[in-house]
């Protein structure tokens, strides 16, 4: 029997080391134990993946959670799941289609009318590397949903967020933003040959630029805004890439994926952290990679690009009277 002890001990050591390495590489659990009783939280794209897990985490902490999703059947099912698991009955589903400016305006109008406050807005929903689709209003899908939809939604809810201050806005970006570039001559991919990867990277860079500019405009308001990269997660977001479902991925790359790819539960920890951590109460305009604050790509910190993107985004979504007043941009 003793001859098996050494191999078993070695195997256990290796397995333990692998688990510790995975925890180190993929981040870890939200270090904050703060609760949010009585606070109203909106999570977009919360019917599945990171969004659902984020809503679950915040429901456990006592929040009044609003799941904002396009597919109401899935959204209602997710809300029911979360209520059952957390015994928090203040979890509700609302319809929001970020590919429709009309839907965004209708959603915001109902929130403003029916909700006493909005303490936390988590712009989680996203589209990744889809075919060359367009939104209801004719925008390239990834730029339209990932950036423009959340840009409009956030601006429409700013007065409610300011009235609820201190409040927080969390924008989910991606490490892919470092490969992005804002092409002001063709934001909508009307003249260039469509490149779904480049379009995705552009949309994620736009989110970080939006975060930076919004933070500047919100100084002194009691509302903070930060962007984050949640990590690579095994969710429906990557369904258009095909990589998670391929035989090559599941066999040859299996060990690497196990090490680097997060579960939705783990990928929801950064959003949870930015939403509740007391030590982040006054942190704004920053970019987080997982649970750690890091410098974004150089273009993401270009103030002139951020101002120009804001002005163009406002024009595209018809935001004639932004909630946050600003001096005219220099010509």
Curated annotation (Swiss-Prot):
Subcellular location: Mitochondrion inner membrane
Family to which this protein belongs: Belongs to the short-chain dehydrogenases/reductases (SDR) family.
Lineage, opening ranks: Eukaryota, Metazoa, Chordata, Craniata, Vertebrata
Keywords: Acetylation, Lipid metabolism, Membrane, Mitochondrion, Mitochondrion inner membrane, NADP, Oxidoreductase, Phosphoprotein
Gene Ontology cellular component annotations, sorted alphabetically: mitochondrial inner membrane; mitochondrion
Primary location group: mitochondrion
Free-text tissue specificity from the UniProt record: Widely expressed. In the retina, detected in the inner segment of the photoreceptor cells. Weak signals are observed in a small population of inner nuclear neurons and the inner plexiform layer.
Stated name of the protein: Retinol dehydrogenase 13
Pfam families in alphabetical order: adh_short
Purpose: Retinol dehydrogenase with a clear preference for NADP. Oxidizes all-trans-retinol, but seems to reduce all-trans-retinal with much higher efficiency. Has no activity toward steroids.
Transmembrane segments: none
Source organism: Homo sapiens (Human)
Enzyme Commission code(s) on record: 1.1.1.300
Residues holding NADP(+): 45-51
Gene3D superfamilies xref list: NAD(P)-binding Rossmann-like Domain (3.40.50.720)
Enzyme active site: 200 (proton acceptor)
Lyase as UniProt keyword: no
GO molecular function per UniProt: all-trans-retinol dehydrogenase (NADP+) activity
Phosphoserine PTM sites in chain numbering: 323
Modification type N-acetylserine: residues: 2
Coiled coil feature spans: none
Topology in the lipid bilayer: Peripheral membrane protein
Pathway: Cofactor metabolism; retinol metabolism
GO BP annotations listed: eye photoreceptor cell development; response to high light intensity; retina layer formation; retinal metabolic process
Reactions it catalyzes: all-trans-retinol + NADP(+) = all-trans-retinal + NADPH + H(+)
Positions bound to substrate: 174
């Amino acid at each position: 029997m003793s001859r098996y002890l050494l191999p078993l001990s070695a195997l256990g050591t290796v397995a333990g080391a692998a688990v510790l390495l995975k925890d180190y590489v993929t981040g870890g659990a939200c270090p904050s134990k703060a609760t949010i009783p009585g606070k109203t939280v909106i999570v977009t794209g919360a019917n599945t993946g990171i969004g659902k897990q984020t809503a679950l985490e915040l429901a456990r902490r006592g929040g009044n959670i609003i799941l904002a999703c396009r597919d109401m059947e899935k959204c209602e099912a997710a809300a029911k799941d979360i209520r059952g698991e957390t015994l928090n009955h203040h979890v509700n589903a609302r319809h929001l289609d970020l590919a429709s400016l009309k839907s965004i305006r209708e959603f915001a109008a109902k929130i403003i009318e029916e909700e006493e406050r909005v303490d936390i807005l988590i712009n989680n929903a996203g589209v990744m590397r889809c075919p060359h689709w367009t939104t209801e209003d004719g925008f390239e899908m990834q730029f339209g949903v990932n950036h423009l939809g959340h840009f409009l939604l956030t601006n429409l809810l700013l007065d409610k967020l300011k009235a609820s201050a201190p409040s927080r806005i969390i924008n989910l970006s991606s490490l892919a933003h470092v490969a992005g570039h804002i092409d002001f001559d063709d934001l909508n991919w009307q003249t260039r040959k469509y490149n779904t990867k480049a379009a995705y990277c552009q949309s994620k860079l736009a989110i970080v630029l939006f975060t930076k500019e919004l933070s500047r405009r919100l100084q002194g308001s009691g509302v903070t805004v930060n962007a984050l990269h949640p990590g690579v997660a095994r969710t429906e977001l990557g369904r258009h890439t095909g990589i998670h479902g391929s035989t090559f991925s599941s066999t040859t790359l299996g060990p690497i994926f196990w090490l680097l790819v997060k579960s939705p539960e783990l990928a929801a920890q950064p959003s949870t952290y930015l939403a509740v951590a007391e030590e982040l109460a006054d942190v704004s305009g920053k970019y987080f990679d997982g649970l750690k604050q890091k410098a974004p790509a150089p273009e993401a910190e270009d103030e002139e690009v951020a101002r120009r993107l804001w002005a163009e985004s406002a024009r595209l979504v018809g935001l004639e009277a932004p909630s946050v007043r600003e001096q005219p941009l220099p010509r």
